[in-house]
Amino acid sequence: MYWVYITEDSEAGITIGFSAEMDKTFLKLSARGTPLFYLRSFSIPFDALAHKHLLEDLSLKTIKRFIRTYQAETKRCRDRLLINYDEKQTF
């Protein structure tokens, strides 16, 4: 899977990222205490990168609307990452 995510912190502001290894990226973000506000998965890397570039071209107001609109999907994806992490830790 390929992932597009959005984080926000007081120093860097909003960051729109892409990851092919979201479990590792999620751990790094968690270790730094960086909240994950938006997370969406894609099966094709081109689609993920196109979505990332679309988000980068949008206004901050529209990005915040995306974050609100996809809150439930972001939570499901985040929970799935946590479950996968827990399963890996038990082996």
Predicted ranges, named:
Residues 2-32, 41, 53-57:
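GIY-YIG-like beta-to-alpha core
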Residues 2-5, 38, 70, 85:
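Sequence-level detector for tyrosine residue identity
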Residues 8, 22, 46, 78, ...:
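Intrinsic-disorder/low-complexity regions
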Residues 13, 27, 51, 61, ...:
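A generic signature of intrinsically disordered, low-complexity regions enriched in glycine/proline
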Residues 30-75:
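Aromatic/basic micro-patches that form nucleic-acid/chromatin recognition or nuclease catalytic surfaces
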Residues 70-91:
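A cross-kingdom feature marking charged/low-complexity
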